Amino acid sequence: MSKPTTIAVLQKCKQEKKRFATITAYDYSFAKLFADEGINVMLVGDSLGMTIQGHDSTLPVTVEDIAYHTRAVRRGAPNCLLLSDLPFMAYATPEQAFENAAIVMRAGANMVKIEGGAWLVDTVKMLTERAVPVCGHLGLTPQSVNIFGGYKIQGRGDAGQILLDDALALEAAGAQLLVLECVPVELAKRVTEALSIPVIGIGAGNVTDGQILVMHDAFGITGGHIPKFAKNFLAEAGDMRAAVRQYMAEVESGVYPGEEHSFH
């Protein structure tokens, strides 16, 4: 039986400059498939609002939804490092964040992911002091879609320094991982090098410590708009298991994401 994957394993990957692949998972069967093929880090993302529930954003997702899918994924991948999103309006105050984090941690998560910058410092401190590990999320944060006016690249120009400052503030508050979404490669490189914690990219080029993809994008079953950073690994591989292996291999070698998947 394989040993449980911990944050220390990812920290070692960063130190040794070994890229690692992660993926979203929402149910037992796919979680088991991913674990069987060697993916040791999974995210129960609020992306399930769009991919599973059919909404046009992540905003309708509830804490109960996340807990339900977390339990299913944990059964399929008992030894993976499992991140679970706290959904929209589930962490508006530190106290609310702690209450909802407790629900998803009891459901099987190892860590909670929250979207936002320096305003979350007190929340991150409160959670980590109470043994709830935190993954930050900067750049394009889908829960803020109504503020951004759509799904747009973040961190260009002066906004890049603000994002870097936010990343450093989250790390100082105790965050142990950071997801960077849809930012220029140059900024992703600066952030990854400035932080001592592992940085996982999606639409941030191949310069981050790890990569994450929504599983539906990796299998080409997105429907409608296909994000620039996505790649259909199933098209070349022929079956799902081979597609997962190809995704991992291309991330680890730095082939994916390529220039065609990146922003500047």
From Swiss-Prot:
Binding annotation for Mg(2+): 46, 85, 115
Swiss-Prot/TrEMBL cofactor(s): Mg(2+)
Binding positions for 3-methyl-2-oxobutanoate per the UniProt entry: 46-47, 85, 113
Reactions that this protein is recorded to catalyse: 3-methyl-2-oxobutanoate + (6R)-5,10-methylene-5,6,7,8-tetrahydrofolate + H2O = 2-dehydropantoate + (6S)-5,6,7,8-tetrahydrofolate
GO annotations of cellular component type: cytoplasm
Active site annotation, chain numbering: 181 (proton acceptor)
Entries under Pfam families matching the protein: Pantoate_transf
Keywords assigned: Cytoplasm, Magnesium, Metal-binding, Pantothenate biosynthesis, Transferase
One GO-annotated biological process of the protein: pantothenate biosynthetic process
EC numbers: 2.1.2.11
InterPro entries on file: Pantoate_hydroxy_MeTrfase (IPR003700), Pyrv/PenolPyrv_kinase-like_dom (IPR015813), Pyrv_kinase-like_dom_sf (IPR040442)
Free-text comment on the cofactor: Binds 1 Mg(2+) ion per subunit.
Subunit structure: Homodecamer; pentamer of dimers.
Functional description taken from the UniProt entry: Catalyzes the reversible reaction in which hydroxymethyl group from 5,10-methylenetetrahydrofolate is transferred onto alpha-ketoisovalerate to form ketopantoate.
Name this protein carries in UniProt: 3-methyl-2-oxobutanoate hydroxymethyltransferase
Underlying gene: panB
